[in-house]
């Protein structure tokens, strides 16, 4: 069984762990850089990206994650953290050749749920203060999902990033299946 690490600084950790189990993988909560050893993939969950970034710096995660050679899935704030820039001064991993529009859909009260398509399958997506891709900086970045023309899912190399919370919807497991099939099992 594959082991999927879930960065345990902030976010819906239990919900991600449940989804990982549903795709027959073992979840491992990552709280220290040493916890990264032995995992087959990493999930960077949602939360508040500036806070997560600062904590990643404090705990020594930035360089360690940048040097991982495993698939990484970023959801919501995880997408922000993987990006090259947001127009705001904040710590980023800078591993994904996109810029991000933070909170592109508005504030917490503007959060919504909507059906989108990912990998040819419909997914009930939960958008909470969700980002969007602003600019694609490399031809290696592939769009994997859109919402009314706005880019909400991309992949590049062994990195996948989405602006919504798959862990919060029943059929969000489709996202984890897609990540497992197209990234983790191919690594």
Curated annotation (Swiss-Prot):
The protein's annotated pathway: Cofactor biosynthesis; pyridoxal 5'-phosphate biosynthesis
CDD domains, per the entry: GATase1_PB
UniProt KW keywords: Glutamine amidotransferase, Hydrolase, Lyase, Pyridoxal phosphate
UniProt GO molecular function: glutaminase activity; pyridoxal 5'-phosphate synthase (glutamine hydrolysing) activity
Gene3D superfamilies linked: 3.40.50.880
Recorded catalytic activity of this chain's protein: aldehydo-D-ribose 5-phosphate + D-glyceraldehyde 3-phosphate + L-glutamine = pyridoxal 5'-phosphate + L-glutamate + phosphate + 3 H2O + H(+); L-glutamine + H2O = L-glutamate + NH4(+)
Enzyme Commission number(s): 4.3.3.6, 3.5.1.2
Catalytic site: 76 (nucleophile), 165 (charge relay system), 167 (charge relay system)
Cysteines joined through disulfide linkages: none
GO biological process terms, semicolon-separated: glutamine catabolic process; pyridoxal phosphate biosynthetic process; pyridoxine metabolic process
Domain of life of the source: Archaea
Bilayer-crossing regions: none
Gene Ontology CC annotation, any one: glutaminase complex
Positions bound to L-glutamine: 47-49, 102, 128-129
Family recorded in the similarity comment: Belongs to the glutaminase PdxT/SNO family.
Record function comment: Catalyzes the hydrolysis of glutamine to glutamate and ammonia as part of the biosynthesis of pyridoxal 5'-phosphate. The resulting ammonia molecule is channeled to the active site of PdxS.
Assembly: In the presence of PdxS, forms a dodecamer of heterodimers. Only shows activity in the heterodimer.
This protein's name: Pyridoxal 5'-phosphate synthase subunit PdxT
